């Protein structure tokens, strides 16, 4: 299946499309994930479903404290809470699984 092109979309729209079950291409901007992801680099995200395995160091599209991030899972607590942060040592905060919309499965 060809991925839905989320590029240029607001992250809340991308999150909605992922919740609808669409695989999507997302472009991230900024320096917070370098060198793992460069500013302007696109990734393929798959929707996070009940059976999706989430692990430390996975890159996910999530919502933390009202903001959307394409950041790393730093830690997992009780198999249901996830500490999200960037690649430069800055944590964003803890989220529940339902605040994680997509998991990066390929860097383009």
Where are the regions that the model predicts?
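Extended hydrophobic leader/signal-anchor segments used for secretion and membrane insertion
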Residues: 1-108
């Amino acid at each position: 299946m060809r991925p839905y092109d989320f590029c240029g979309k607001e992250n809340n729209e991308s999150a909605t499309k992922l919740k609808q079950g669409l695989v999507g291409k997302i472009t991230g901007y900024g320096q917070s994930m370098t060198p793992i992801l460069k500013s302007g680099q696109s990734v393929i995200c798959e929707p996070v479903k009940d059976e999706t395995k989430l692990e430390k160091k996975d890159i996910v599209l999530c919502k933390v404290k009202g903001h959307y991030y394409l950041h790393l899972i730093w830690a997992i607590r009780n198999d249901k809470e996830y500490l999200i942060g960037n690649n430069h040592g800055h944590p964003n905060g803890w989220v529940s699984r339902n605040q994680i919309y997509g998991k990066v499965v390929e860097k383009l």
